[in-house]
Swiss-Prot record:
Pfam families cross-referenced by the UniProt entry: Flp_C (PF05202), Flp_N (PF03930)
Name used for this protein in its record: Recombinase Flp protein
Keywords: DNA integration, DNA recombination, Plasmid
Function per UniProt: Catalyzes the recombination between the large inverted repetitions of the plasmid.
Active site: 339
Protein family membership: Belongs to the 'phage' integrase family.
Compositional bias (Basic and acidic residues): 470-491
Gene this protein is translated from: A
A GO molecular function held by the record: DNA binding
Biological process per Gene Ontology, one example term: DNA integration
Species name: Zygosaccharomyces bisporus
Ranges of Low complexity composition bias in the record: 444-455
UniProt KW Repeat keyword: no
């Protein structure tokens, strides 16, 4: 066998020697070994000024191996290559490996003029299958955005993982990859290549604290960051997912992806886990999206987050979060954006919006929901000084990770898990990230109303009974202080600063108003829907999904609050 690692560091003389040794076996030569040597020789010659990537090597090696032949009598080696004109390549290899000769054919089919002129048009049929797949993906993502919220899609996929996995380890890994790639708008390989030694704690005004890690080896070889933060939907909490991952999996030595030398020693998980992730959803498709041949699996998180932010008219944030370039004013669910990793600074409100602690109002401003107390409760006591007992506990809890990841980060994770793990299955309510402001419902202090009206909060997509605390918040929101105003958050807020765990938690007092937003299913957010404010004794109307999709009703209460139907 001839693998990438066996050949990537070889000099020309070494490759020539291995080539001759392989052909001494005559017709019984090893096709895998010979195709690997030829592929590496071609890539080293053509890409003399760039790097030779492992993925490129494996792709071209497969093409060469499929049509590789050796004529012992004439010492001629023939194979098929992906270039359209292979004459120059044939001459070059014949000169480099003389006295052997090369006969290379192109796998690009020549266009027949006879066929071309007999056809109905000169339209190009190139990449027809890719266009067909893109069209299928766009259609399915469009239906996901209208008939079913993207967060509901994630929740259903998590349910599929829980019911179809055989081991806790498999469930933990699949859940981890799904959530991280979605909330970071990244490829699976970006998550895999996270350098565990770069984890650090960062303070954020809108979610309390973040964990940040660096990806040094991306597709463009420009580093980017991956973020972990609390999510208001309990099952999506990224801190808890990271804790479970560290407890279940062991660190993996960094795999070599190119001929360039990297100082990184460890990566987050093995390459095979990405393959297992794709195979799982191919075998157990939780949605028609997974059933598309060559459909988005490794890029699923990127597709979903692009669609979600595009739906909320926040495309520029998708570009910053995922480091994708976009100059097109169109839907991005196809994820056709170019790669422009450049370590862009992210606006702090982005994390509050994704976490569900902030929403986007009709004017396009990101506004707080007055949930600072809830956020502070998540981190109460977590940033206290270390003690000697915890030093021993993190080694027992996280094993080999304790030798790689910062001790401050692991203590932070362990304390957060101990305090908040019970939240995970208490309440599975999904929250909208968008305000609707209509004639019948006006926000506190808004123009056009004689007196400031109380804000209305409509819970959506409840997957079970709301917790007592959630019910109290709902009732309290109906009697919110009329004098409170919505705090508009400047998207150009100052950048987050790194906070070591030894420091005490000294957060600045914020002036966010204690106001609750209108909660509506994101997939049905429509300006044509008008809501009347509830009576003093009445109950806020519930919003769910249309009957036939999950078996729930769409505002079917006897005391219906909807005055105008949703336009489809």
């Amino acid at each position: 066998m001839s693998s990438y690692m066996d050949l990537v560091d070889d000099e020309p003389a070494t490759l020539y020697h291995k080539f001759v040794e392989c052909l001494k076996a005559g017709e019984n030569f090893c096709g895998d070994k010979l195709s690997g040597i030829i592929t590496m020789a071609i890539l080293k010659a053509i890409k003399a000024l760039t790097e030779v990537k492992k993925t490129t090597f494996n792709k071209y090696k497969t093409t060469i191996k499929q049509g590789l032949q050796y004529d012992v009598g004439s010492s001629t080696i023939s194979f098929v290559y992906h270039l359209k004109d292979c004459d120059e390549l044939s001459r070059g290899l014949s000169d480099a490996f003389e006295p052997y000769k090369f006969k290379i054919k192109s796998n690009k089919e020549a266009t027949s003029f006879k066929t071309l002129f007999r056809g109905p048009s000169f339209g190009s049929q190139k990449n027809w299958r890719k266009k067909e797949v893109d069209r299928e993906v766009d259609n399915l993502f469009h239906s996901t955005e209208t008939d079913e919220s993207i967060f509901k899609f994630i929740l259903n996929t998590l349910d599929s993982i829980e019911t179809q996995t055989n081991t806790d380890r498999q469930k933990t890994v699949l859940t981890f990859i799904l959530l991280m790639t979605f909330f970071n708008c990244c490829r699976n390989n970006d998550l895999m290549n996270v350098d565990p030694s770069t984890f650090k704690i960062v303070k954020n005004k809108f979610v309390g604290y973040l964990l940040q890690a660096e990806v040094k080896q991306t597709k463009t070889r420009k580093s980017r960051n991956i973020f972990f933060f609390p999510i208001r939907e309990n099952r999506f909490d990224l801190f808890l997912a990271l804790h479970d991952f560290f407890r279940t999996c062991q660190p993996t030595p960094k795999s070599r992806l190119s001929d360039q030398v990297s100082e990184q020693k460890w990566q987050l998980f093995r390459d095979s886990m990405v393959i297992d992730y794709n195979r799982f959803f191919r075998k157990f498709p939780a949605s028609p999206i997974f059933a598309i041949k060559h459909g988005p699996k490794s890029h699923l998180g990127r597709h979903l987050m692009n669609s979600f932010l595009h739906k909320n008219e926040l495309d520029s944030w998708a570009n910053s979060l995922g480091n994708w370039s976009s100059s097109q004013n169109q839907r991005e669910s196809g994820a056709r954006l170019g790669y422009t990793h450049g370590g862009r600074d992210l606006p702090q409100p982005l994390f509050g919006f994704l976490a569900g602690y902030c929403v986007r109002n009709e004017e396009g401003h990101i506004v707080g929901l007055g949930l600072e107390k809830d956020i502070n409760d998540l981190f109460d006591g977590i940033m206290d000084p270390l003690n000697e007992k915890e030093d021993t506990e993190i080694c027992e809890s996280y094993g080999e990770w304790a030798k790689i990841v910062s001790k401050d980060v692991l203590i932070f994770l362990k304390r957060y898990h101990s305090k908040n793990a019970c939240r995970r299955y208490q309440n599975s309510t999904l929250y909208a990230r968008t305000f609707l402001k209509t004639e019948s419902v006006t926000l506190s202090g808004s123009k056009g109303s004689e007196e400031p009206s109380s804000p209305v909060r409509i819970p959506i997509l409840s997957m079970g009974k709301a917790s007592p605390s959630e019910g109290r918040k709902l009732r309290a929101s109906e009697h919110a202080n009329d004098d409170n105003e919505i705090e508009k958050i400047d998207s150009d807020s100052s950048q987050s600063e790194e906070i070591p765990i030894e420091m005490s938690d000294s957060e600045d007092e914020t002036t966010a108003s204690n106001i609750s937003g209108i909660y509506l299913d994101m997939s049905k957010a429509n300006s044509n829907v008008v809501y009347s404010p509830p009576s003093q004794t009445g109950r806020a109307a519930g919003a769910g999904r249309k009957r036939g999709v999950g078996g729930r009703r769409t505002v079917e209460s006897k005391r219906r609050r909807v005055l105008a139907p949703i336009n489809r």
